[in-house]
């Protein structure tokens, strides 16, 4: 069952199995196994949604079963930032080979690697199992379970996600549908975004009026300066 967004955004009920990279809760990736989609959420607003492919063997965190783990994870490492689209990786190293989408007979990890680590007991082996978000040349399989445990994406999509998601970003893999999240305002600065679990902070006029006497507001200083100028002009 998908846990409330307030828990996701607040990150208040998660006890990490081990802490290597600090978790960044202003950046979240939500992956729905049911929808076969990935949603990028930044500062409480939906930035993008991409089709994905999770494991053809189901869900879980079992050694040797090639399943996709569920629960809360985090981006531990990013590999391939300067590699060309379609770059083939073997043991997380660029081989020099580049594949086009739907290249016949090949199914390697390509383009980008976003390596995940588990934050809960139910996904504690994710990092050691090599669970990635990565590109695949088999783009025709995107949108249905077809991977061997990882989360596959189209090359152009995983490259875009790679550039938007920092190390430490929170990742949730859920068996439920993606939650409804409002789109992030495009024209609003990121620093002023309001998360789903927070409200805009406004200052009560009464609090402003009760400020200490030795502290002047900008408006008070402006009025004081204008009054002083008027008095000086009257003396001339």
Show which residues each predicted segment covers:
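Exported/periplasmic cell-wall-interacting domains
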Residues: 20-24, 62-66, 83-222, 227-236
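Bacterial N-terminal signal peptides
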Residues: 4-16
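Pocket-edge structural micro-motifs
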Residues: 33, 42, 54, 76-77, ...
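Electropositive
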Residues: 47, 51-79, 83
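Structural motif
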Residues: 35-37, 72, 113
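A structural motif detector for short, solvent-exposed N-terminal "entry" segments of globular domains
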Residues: 20-59
